[in-house]
């Protein structure tokens, strides 16, 4: 499996609920292109317009850019020129949905604000990706600042993944499919806004209600739901349900944190994986070369 294999949903090839839906995207970087790729996987006919300088993601990660744009017709246009605008509106006339990732003033300068588009293309639905909702939509930001605002950064280290962007891409998909469905029913375009800071807040919800996070039930409060050191690496245990907890206690020689830690220390990653398969335990172990915990104190030894 390639590193980008998880980009697309693993549905049967015959599952194409968006067949016949025509989507145009002007969104650069990560959330918009990820959403576009997944809409294409569901059968939508997708196109993308990039500025003459291209999408910055191409230089940041060529492999991810290629994966996101496989099967996408990409066209370079300067939307600040009359020829570029004429070409854009020709595509919009044949589109059902437009994805953008500009701040509101930039949309207005390009003639892509809601009022202008509704007048020119009343059938067209739009999903506008912004950093923050409502009156804060013009405030700049990126994944890191959205995670910080949501309280998802608990050290000075950078996060290990772009959680707000990737979660945001799924929210964009949800909005896109909902807009298409309502527009089909009403005959009128639907205009929605997705804020990436809201997506980060959504991802933070389990922490906010006290379910996850340091010291919470799923943040180290349960001995059977934790990360331990094993003989040659690390092991993640998720024996949450009673039958899993009972199986773990039986093979570990006890249910206490000390008993589980001792059991993990005396086995290697491969041994623990084999035991997990034999006893139907939710466990994943990996050897030392991959075991580089980012936050000291999260690993039980």
Regions found by a protein language model. Give the residues of each.
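Short acidic/polar mixed-charge low-complexity motifs
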Residues: 73, 188, 233-235
């Amino acid at each position: 499996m390639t590193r980008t294999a998880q980009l697309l949903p693993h549905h049967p090839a015959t599952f194409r609920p968006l067949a016949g839906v025509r989507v145009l995207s002007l969104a650069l970087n990560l959330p918009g292109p990820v959403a576009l790729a997944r809409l294409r996987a569901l059968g939508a006919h997708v196109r993308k317009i990039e500025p003459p300088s291209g999408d910055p993601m191409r230089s940041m990660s060529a492999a991810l850019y290629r994966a996101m744009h496989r099967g996408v017709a990409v066209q370079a246009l300067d939307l600040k020129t009359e020829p570029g605008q004429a070409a854009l509106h020709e595509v919009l006339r044949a589109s059902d949905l437009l994805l953008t990732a500009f701040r509101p003033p930039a949309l207005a300068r390009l003639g892509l604000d809601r009022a202008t588009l509704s007048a020119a293309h009343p059938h067209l639905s739009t999903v506008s990706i912004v950093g923050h909702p409502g009156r804060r939509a013009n405030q700049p930001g990126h994944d890191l600042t959205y995670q910080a605002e949501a309280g998802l950064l608990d050290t000075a280290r950078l996060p290990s993944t772009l959680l707000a962007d990737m979660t945001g891409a799924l929210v964009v998909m949800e909005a896109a499919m909902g807009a298409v469905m309502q527009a089909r029913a009403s005959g009128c375009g639907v205009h929605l806004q997705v804020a990436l800071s809201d997506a980060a807040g959504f991802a933070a919800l389990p922490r906010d209600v006290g379910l996850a996070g340091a010291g919470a039930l799923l943040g180290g409060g349960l001995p059977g739901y934790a990360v331990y050191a094993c003989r040659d690496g690390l092991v993640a245990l998720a024996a949450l349900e009673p039958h899993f907890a009972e199986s773990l206690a039986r093979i570990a020689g006890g249910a206490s944190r000390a008993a589980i830690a001792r059991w993990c220390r005396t086995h290697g990653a491969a041994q623990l994986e084999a035991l997990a398969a034999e006893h139907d335990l939710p466990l994943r172990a990996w050897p030392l070369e991959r075991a580089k915990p980012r936050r000291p104190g999260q690993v039980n030894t």
